[in-house]
Amino acid sequence: MSEFINVTVVREANVFFNGGVVSRTVIFPDGTKKTLGIMQPGEYTFNTGAPEIMEILTGELDLKLPGSDLWDRIGGGESFEVPANSSFTMKVLSLTDYCCSFLG
């Protein structure tokens, strides 16, 4: 879906890593949340509270998921899941547009 209808967008930005990652929170009528954001090239480690699905809309990154020593290349049109209460690392190779869905 390229468009969300009847949602609330939080005006203030979520800024991480000195502006290397910036997103906006979108709240749906049922209370679920997503963030829409941009990542600049760089390496970032995120911690999760809830499980997440990260959809990469455009761009390219190398990804290391919890419990893995391997890096996987992820590009536009691909997605990955991250369990709750874990961390994952991304080496962003080019400007990357993403949508993160918070589950549970």
Swiss-Prot record:
Extract the GO molecular function terms from the UniProt entry: guanosine phosphorylase activity; purine-nucleoside phosphorylase activity; thymidine phosphorylase activity; uridine phosphorylase activity
- What's the family? Belongs to the nucleoside phosphorylase PpnP family.
Does the keyword Transferase belong to this entry? Answer: yes
Q: Does the keyword ATP-binding apply?
A: no
**Keyword annotations for this protein?**
Glycosyltransferase, Transferase
Please state what the protein is called.
Pyrimidine/purine nucleoside phosphorylase
Organism field: Geobacter metallireducens (strain ATCC 53774 / DSM 7210 / GS-15)
Q: Give the top-rank taxon of the lineage listed in the UniProt record for this protein.
A: Bacteria
The record's listing under HAMAP family reads: Nucleos_phosphorylase_PpnP (MF_01537)
Q: What is its EC number?
A: 2.4.2.1, 2.4.2.2
- Mention any one GO cellular component term assigned to this protein in its UniProt record: cytosol
- A Pfam family recorded for this sequence: Ppnp
SUPFAM superfamilies documented for this protein: RmlC-like cupins (SSF51182)
The protein's role, per its UniProt record? Catalyzes the phosphorolysis of diverse nucleosides, yielding D-ribose 1-phosphate and the respective free bases. Can use uridine, adenosine, guanosine, cytidine, thymidine, inosine and xanthosine as substrates. Also catalyzes the reverse reactions.
Provide the catalytic activity annotation: a purine D-ribonucleoside + phosphate = a purine nucleobase + alpha-D-ribose 1-phosphate; adenosine + phosphate = alpha-D-ribose 1-phosphate + adenine; cytidine + phosphate = cytosine + alpha-D-ribose 1-phosphate; guanosine + phosphate = alpha-D-ribose 1-phosphate + guanine
